[in-house]
Amino acid sequence: MITLKTTPFHQAHQDAGAKLVDFAGWELPIHYGSQIAEHEAVRTDAGMFDVSHMLVTDVAGANAKAFFRKLIANDVAKLAFVGKALYSALLNDNGGVIDDLIVYRTNEAETQYRIVSNGATREKDTAQFHKVGQEFGVSFNPRYDLGMLAVQGPKAIEKLLTVKPEWADVVHNLKPFQGADLGNDWFVARTGYTGEDGVEVILPGTEAVAFFKALQAAGVQPCGLGARDTLRMEAGMNLYGNDMDDDTSPLEAGMGWTVDLKDESRDFVGKAALLALKEKGVAVKQVGLLLGKGGILRAHMEVLTDKGKGETTSGVFSPSLKQSIAIARVPKDFDGDTAKVLIRGKEADVRVLKLPFVRNGQKQFD
């Protein structure tokens, strides 16, 4: 019997009536009664997600900036000030995606940074950090003592500030992809995985339950992994292991914007493989699919286009659109606005759309 890991919020989940499930070895809420209600709370009001299974790693050393310029495909030289965040792929030598992560610059001297990476990939991420880090003499401090809570939705910040009014100036000054150290191991960033405004709060594990319950009392809806998935799907955001993996290039997964090739003198892990793929030509591209009626789109369904076959990588019923949606990879030279998907052996018509489907509560297509 495998003992599941628990987060600092575990007691709060139990007290809130969560249905707990195994997610990558962690016991986490799938919902607290109604996945649909939780989804709608984030689109119209405020919801919160325990994301403490994600790994926070503090990196320090005189060569920390050079280390990150080698480690990831995006370039930390763009982090112009303390607290600025950068989204990037972490690549292997073949140009496949080990993980996607966020890096924060945490001091003026560019000698300290913070990584937030996915929970399901923490072992291979950590192995890659250490492998690349050897030549740079940097230190790694995995912050197992911290919890992390995403507070998301159009009223998320308003409700957060009823609990933490002293944060008002800091939080109101944060633009998307900026974070701030609030002292005593509290950190807040204007980031998220829902397509709505909001923040992610990193905090001491010992203070997690009290913070969760205070937000709950302020009207923030606890949300589980089910709503997290439907929200990120509507927002057209990739899920590691579905929409990209060790054998998928970021250029094939809608992540080309996270690859920075401007500084030709910078070498990073996977760069040679990416350049070779660009030279050869990327065979597929990422699109969104919208099913007209009947059936549900799921991962690994065959997509039929006039330029050849593709495949869905994620699929779900969208609570906001009341239709089934999918993220898919299709032939690069396909530019039609309709295709077909095989559902239980039968062809179903789908619209082909540019991602995202929904952003800030609004449908993004006609």
From Swiss-Prot:
Pfam (any one): GCV_T
Q: Which reaction does it catalyse?
A: N(6)-[(R)-S(8)-aminomethyldihydrolipoyl]-L-lysyl-[protein] + (6S)-5,6,7,8-tetrahydrofolate = N(6)-[(R)-dihydrolipoyl]-L-lysyl-[protein] + (6R)-5,10-methylene-5,6,7,8-tetrahydrofolate + NH4(+)
**N-terminal signal peptide:** none
Q: Which GO terms describe its biological process?
A: glycine decarboxylation via glycine cleavage system
Q: What class of enzyme is it?
A: transferase
What residue ranges carry the coiled-coil annotation? none
Record's Gene Ontology CC terms?
cytosol; glycine cleavage complex
Question: Does the record carry Oxidoreductase as a key word?
Answer: no
Keyword Transferase among record annotations: yes
Q: Name one GO molecular function term.
A: aminomethyltransferase activity
Tell me, how does this one assemble? Answer: The glycine cleavage system is composed of four proteins: P, T, L and H.
HAMAP family in the record: GcvT
The free-text function statement in the UniProt record for this protein reads: The glycine cleavage system catalyzes the degradation of glycine.
Can you say what this protein is called? Aminomethyltransferase
| Organism annotation | Neisseria meningitidis serogroup A / serotype 4A (strain DSM 15465 / Z2491)
The major lineage groups are: Bacteria, Pseudomonadati, Pseudomonadota, Betaproteobacteria, Neisseriales
